[in-house]
Amino acid sequence: MESLTMEIIAYDRGHSMDFFCHVPNGTCRLTIYDTCPSVMFLSTLIVNEKCRKQGIGTAILEEVEKIAKESGCDVISLQVKHNSWMKDWYLRNGFIPVADGYNYNNVIMSKFVENIKGE
């Protein structure tokens, strides 16, 4: 896949720092809360359904990992449905289940920044 140009917008909300990452046909939202600065929460990662399996999600996730490292975070955490293809995708990308989610259908998954390859 050719290199994607990613637009990153950082927004300081006073109690948290939000990052919005946009590429053609994909986007994500990240949050670092002042009360838990070592954890970056990945609340959204979306790729246009017609454009999946082209490496866009992986490219976005690589940028998420880069932002986590640069922000001094130790962990990237997210919540996903137990029985979804997304859970399998995150497992293949190094995330591990760490707890049940906020409802019985979800699982919280995390990836330790020290386990991120590159640079």
Regions found by a protein language model. Name each.
Residues 47, 53-66, 92:
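Conserved acetyl-CoA-binding loop-helix of GNAT-fold acetyltransferases
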Residues 42-45, 61, 78, 86:
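Generic leucine side-chain signal with a strong bias for well-ordered alpha-helical environments
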Residues 1-43, 48, 67, 100-104:
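Acetyl-CoA-dependent GNAT
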Residues 77-87, 102-106:
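Conserved beta-strand-loop-alpha-helix junction that forms the acyl-donor binding cleft
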Residues 1-2, 91, 116-119:
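Short intrinsically disordered terminal tails
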Residues 111-114:
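A general lysine-centric signal
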Residues 91-100:
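Conserved acetyl-CoA-binding loop of GNAT-fold acetyltransferases
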